[in-house]
Amino acid sequence: MSLYDINGNEILTGGTGGSSQSELQRKFKDKDIVWIGDSIHAYTQPDGVTIPYLFQYNTGAKCYNWCQGGTTMALMDIANYDAFSGVGMVDCLTSRDFTNQETHMSDRGFTTQVAEMKAFDFSKADYVIIELGTNDNIKLVDLDNEDDPLDTHTTGGALRYMIKKLLTYNPKLNIAVCNIQDGVEGRRNEGLELVYVSKDRNEIIKSVCDKLNIPLIDIFYLLGLNDYTSSTLLSDGLHRTHEGKLKQAKVIERQMNYYF
């Protein structure tokens, strides 16, 4: 079966990168997988598809892509972003109270997704894949708070909070967390060249996952982003080209197949 983008052009899916499609489908076909993340998994540019869509195409899983551009793991006290942050998303999905999301869904362009979230029985989810932290870097969110490990205004505290909430809601839920890539020189934040300290934030993400025995999908290394590959994998110094989406989907497929 061929896959086509929004312009009717055939899309090459690039296979499954070492995991046979039949093996992936035996494991993930018809499984409900919720994706909580940022624009890296939300954007359809430039090819009309997303990374979760490619994962669904290769595995037969039912992927619910509730990723939102610009969102952080942590809260930032900005109402229309916090509603769709990692913390905000987990709160509404586990409490079934979507008041904050409904308040801000129009100005964030998330009306369809909120309707889908409300209609979905989250207790039936098989997996949650968390892909957040890049915007925590860009927006200079604090890494962690030694005095309060559940400080939801830090990346580490927010991730602990999310995992705690999800597993308290459903102890059988399978969770995987993606770490983050390096940025590319030249992206700017408030007129200043952005120093992308992915290593420090990834250490916090890894520490939380290690402590809680949550599988970590190592995007930082396995995507293979460097000075020689950035023009192939990235369209704007951050978001993925079609080739970059194919590779990231393969990485996630392989890692999910390994862990689960």
PLM segments and residue spans:
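Short, low-complexity N-terminal tether/leader segments at secretion or assembly junctions of large
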Residues: 1-22
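A short, charged/proline- and glycine-enriched loop
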Residues: 26-33
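Conserved SGNH/GDSL esterase-like catalytic core that processes O-acyl groups on lipids
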Residues: 32, 40-149
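Short hydrophobic segments within beta-strands
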Residues: 36-37, 178
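A general structural detector for well-ordered alpha-helical segments in enzyme core domains, enriched
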Residues: 51, 116, 155-162, 201-205, ...
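Catalytic His-Asp segment of secreted/periplasmic serine-dependent ester chemistry enzymes
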Residues: 78-84, 180-260
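Active-site segments of SGNH/GDSL-like serine hydrolases
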Residues: 131-138, 163-200
